[in-house]
């Protein structure tokens, strides 16, 4: 039982991180109706900014306190993501209002390669470390209940708590604030939203900035675990099955989908891997996504598309 709980908790914590990356896709799609292929590049760019700023700031400002240095680096990286959001709206999205979805999709591909090159030009291409003080040592829980206890990585616990808190804040933002309702209106119909006075340009800046902050938090967590390197862009590929499973238009769907895939990967690898030679964790999510594409393409919580003729 203890072994099962270890795998279950590990899957839930990994699932929260998947959900965090998937939220960036959902936020952009809900506000602009475009699938943002640049989300992985945004995670990398934000992580690079955080890693380099946290290394440069002590020398620039003479700050010895590590927490204060990381806090200033986070604020600076967040400000950079806001500037990035403003530039994307000003230079790209503003000129593509009401264009076909494939046009917007190609625009996000261009943004992807631009961010990859810009990040390498500004911050370099080495592997960097992000140290925000999360403990690395594992701990044992429920030692009084199970013999030997349940082994849990404390860093994963902290990361999952941060991800869960951000997911909760974003869910409340979308459901309870006037800006969140305006974002949903823009997603439904750009022209109708503009006709009732919703400023489309400002809404797009807000949603790309929120997605940028989400990418920043995801980049910090993944960078702390794996190091900041250019392969970090592939973390977005791990989120693709999540949004297929949960639904591209659903914030709760991104959360539930991430948890299902995280738990499914861990349990299948632990209990089925020995019988098939291992490696299930690599392809499990994609096979599950393929099943949903065949039988429920809108996902668990996505909106079913009905064409009227």
For each feature predicted by the language model, list its residue ranges.
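Membrane-embedded helix boundary and interhelical linker motif in transport proteins
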Residues: 31-87, 91, 149, 272-275
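Transmembrane helix-bundle core of multi-pass membrane transporters
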Residues: 95-96, 101-176, 203-206, 227, ...
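Alpha-helical transmembrane segments within multi-pass membrane transporters and channels
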Residues: 60-111, 118, 256-261, 265, ...
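Inter-helical junctions in multi-pass inner-membrane proteins, predominant
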Residues: 2-17, 152, 173-178, 204-243, ...
